[in-house]
Curated annotation (Swiss-Prot):
Protein name as it appears in the record: N-succinylarginine dihydrolase
Keywords (A to Z) from UniProt: Arginine metabolism, Hydrolase
Example GO molecular function: N-succinylarginine dihydrolase activity
Gene from which this protein is expressed: astB
Coiled coil: none
């Protein structure tokens, strides 16, 4: 039976804007109040996803969330018609309206943690949506995320869906952005690496000072239990709090793994050598640990270029390639390092650059835009086929974007009732294109 890693990319929503909501995310905050281009953002994402499908990768798309989120605004006391709710929120709390209008669900690396059937004790593919409690604008996502995942991975013979963890900082969970699965072959049992920023129970552990540590050890352990992962299939690593304070808000900004490759910055982790030894032992050797020294790429350059927020993919010939943002090309130190990397004795033999600037300016690179799902051909056959990228879906979604999306959006536009109507009309049509059923609040 064939096994592979599929990527499910987040389709950028119609309200993509730059509100600077993500404290600790340097790009998000530094581009606050700029005018965005939702149409370009969506097309950049589609182009990247289609390119991977054309390289022979299994590629799907995840639908965006309903925004502005009128349901949440009503929960906090705004009343009347939908237009009244938007108007009241804009006057009383512009920041709250911005949070409820964020298109942040595009970064599906935060949508959920996924464990393949080869790793779990019950032989099922497990999904747990991330609760994202650290950021208001993202904490309103997990219920709809769960609905969308269930509409795509529906067959209970193969797929197990869990509720997101309790909505409390004790269980702060940021999903796959702090999780990477290592294996020798996608169909073999692997080792799942959970990276956390702090421990709630063990206050003797170091923690960042300037920016929040969004992922707790306790959340990572809970997800591993839900997914029925044994101790010899898991490794827990603490992210270096110093790099969190330098803008590394998720581990996928400072490290990325694929199969038997872990690509990471010298400063990424605490107790690095001991933890790499644990990984090597549980993987039974034959690992490539590619450490990028600070002398070649500073943490600042890594964050600015998103060198590690890249995708490492395995091509049909067995070689690996890096999918990088064009920002890596534009940074001299990073570009020089990547040119050197493909000549070294590692499986990584090529780098492909993509323009995802609309996402980058909000603090999300190629890796943020995708959720990885390792699966076999039987499981893939049970996936909703209408979300899988091919020539027809690419053309259909581009037409859909052209029909429904604006080419400029400012934070002032978020209170426009017409934007809400445009967004709902678009999403209603999208659920028909993708055969998702009624996954949104407004459809019920």
């Amino acid at each position: 039976m064939k096994h592979f890693e599929a990527n499910f990319d987040g389709l950028v929503g119609p309200t993509h804007n730059y509100a600077g909501l993500s404290f600790g995310n340097v790009a998000s905050q530094s581009n606050a109040a700029q005018v965005s281009n939702p149409k370009d953002a969506a097309k950049q994402g589609l182009k990247k996803a289609k390119a991977l499908a054309d390289m022979g990768m299994v590629q799907g798309m995840l639908a965006p969330q309903e925004r502005p989120d009128i349901h949440t605004l009503r929960r906090v006391g705004f009343t009347g018609s939908d237009a009244d709710v938007l108007s009241q929120a804009a006057k009383a709390s512009p920041v709250l309206l911005q949070a409820c209008a964020s298109a942040s669900s595009m970064w599906t690396a935060n949508a959920a943690t996924v464990s393949p059937s080869a790793d779990s004790d019950d032989g099922k593919l497990h999904f747990t949506p991330a609760n994202l409690v650290d950021k208001l604008h993202r904490s309103i996502e997990p219920v709809t995320t769960g609905n969308i995942l269930k509409a795509i991975f529906t067959d209970e013979r193969y797929f197990a869906h869990h509720q997101h963890l309790p909505e409390h900082p004790h269980f702060g969970d940021e999903g796959a952005a702090n999780h990477t699965r290592l294996c020798h072959d996608y169909g073999q049992a692997g080792v799942e690496v959970f990276v956390y920023g702090r421990s709630v129970a063990d206050l003797s552990r170091p923690a960042p000072v300037k920016y929040p540590a969004r992922q707790t050890l306790e959340a990572s352990q809970a997800v591993a239990r839900l997914h029925q992962l044994s101790d010899d299939r898991t490794v827990y690593m603490q992210q270096n709090p110093d790099v969190i304070d330098q803008g590394v808000f998720h581990n996928d900004v400072i490290a990325v793994g694929n199969q038997n490759v872990l690509f990471y910055h010298e400063q990424a982790f605490l107790e690095t050598q001991a933890k790499l030894a644990e990984i090597d032992k549980k993987m039974h050797g034959n690992m490539y640990f590619i450490e990028v020294p600070t002398a070649k790429v500073s943490v600042q350059d890594a964050v600015k270029s998103y060198l590690f927020n890249t995708q490492i993919i395995t091509l049909s010939d067995g070689n690996m390639a890096i999918i990088a943002p064009t920002d890596c090309q534009e940074n001299p130190a990073v570009h020089a390092y990547l040119n050197e990397l493909v000549t070294l004795n590692t499986p990584i033999k090529a780098v492909h650059y993509f323009d995802v600037k609309q996402s980058m300016q909000n603090g999300g690179g190629p890796a943020c835009l995708r959720l990885r799902v390792a699966m076999n051909e039987t499981e893939l056959a049970a996936v909703n086929p209408q979300v899988m990228m091919n020539d027809a879906l690419f053309a259909r979604l581009n037409q859909w974007v052209d029909k429904h999306y604006r080419d400029r959006l400012s934070t002032q536009d978020l209170a426009d009732p017409q934007l809400l109507m445009e967004s709902r009309t678009a999403l209603d049509e999208l659920t028909q294109i993708m055969k998702l059923g009624s996954v949104y609040q407004f459809q019920r």
